[in-house]
Amino acid sequence: MADEDISLNEDQLLESMEETNGEQETEIVTETEEEGSMQIDPELEAIKARVKEMEEEAEKIKQMQSEVDKQMAGGSTTGLAAVPLSLEEKQEIDTRSVYVGNVDYGASAEELEAHFHGCGTINRVTILCNKADGHPKGFAYIEFGSKEFVETALAMNETLFRGRQIKVMSKRTNRPGLSTTNRFARGSFRGRGARASRACCHSTFRGARRAIRGYRGRANYYAPY
C-alpha cells in the first residue's frame, strides 16, 4: 500500500512539473511575440521624421512671412509715397513671385538679379532684413514680369549662389488680416533716374529693361511685399 502511495505521488509530481513547464513555455512565447511587435521600423521612423521636418520648415516660412508683414507695416521712407494695393493686385503679384531661402547674408539684390536673370524679366528683388539692426535675414523675394517665368525660376532650386545651396519656392499670398500696403524698401534701385528710399526692412533692385505691366499712370513707387 505504501508503494502505491509513493508511485501515485511521483505521478502527480511529474504531471505538476509538466504543467509548470508548459506555462513557462507559453509565457516565453508570449513575451517573444510582444518584443517582436514592439520593434521599430527604421524606414517608417525616417519617413515620420522627414514629414515632421517638412511641416516645421513650412511653419517657419509662414512665421517669417507674417513677421516681415508686421515689421514692414511700420516702415517709413523719405520723398516717396507708396500706392496701396488691393488684395487682388497683391495676389496677382504673388503669382509672379518666388521665395528664395538660404541666401548668403552678404549677398546684394543685384547679385540675386544676375543669378535669376536667365529665368525672365525681373521687376523686383527684395532682401528682407531685421528691423532692429538692419542685418539680412537670409531670404528674399523675386518678382518677375510674368508668372510663366516662375516655373523657370523654380528649376533654380538647390542651385549654388555665393557657395550656398538656395531654396526656391512659389511665394504664398499672405492672409488678408496682415496688411501688405504702404511698405517701403531699405535701398531701392529703379533703373535710370530713380531715387533710393530708406526703411528698416528690406532692400530691392528693380530691372530697368521693361516697364512693369498694369501700373501705368500710378505713382513712381509701389511696394507689393
From Swiss-Prot:
Location relative to the cell: Nucleus; Cytoplasm
GO BP field: mRNA 3'-end processing
Cellular component terms (Gene Ontology): cytoplasm; nucleus
Biased composition (Acidic residues): 1-36
Pfam families hit by this protein: RRM_1
Keywords: Coiled coil, Cytoplasm, mRNA processing, Nucleus, RNA-binding
Coiled coil: 14-74
Entry-linked CDD domains: RRM_II_PABPN1
Region (Disordered): 1-42
Positions of the RRM domain: 96-173
Gene Ontology MF: a single term: poly(A) binding
Known function: Involved in the 3'-end formation of mRNA precursors (pre-mRNA) by the addition of a poly(A) tail of 200-250 nt to the upstream cleavage product. Stimulates poly(A) polymerase (PAPOLA) conferring processivity on the poly(A) tail elongation reaction and also controls the poly(A) tail length. Increases the affinity of poly(A) polymerase for RNA. Binds to poly(A) and to poly(G) with high affinity. May protect the poly(A) tail from degradation.
The record's note on its domains: The RRM domain is essential for specific adenine bases recognition in the poly(A) tail but not sufficient for poly(A) binding.
Name of the protein in question: Polyadenylate-binding protein 2
Phylogenetic placement of the source organism: Eukaryota, Metazoa, Ecdysozoa, Arthropoda, Hexapoda
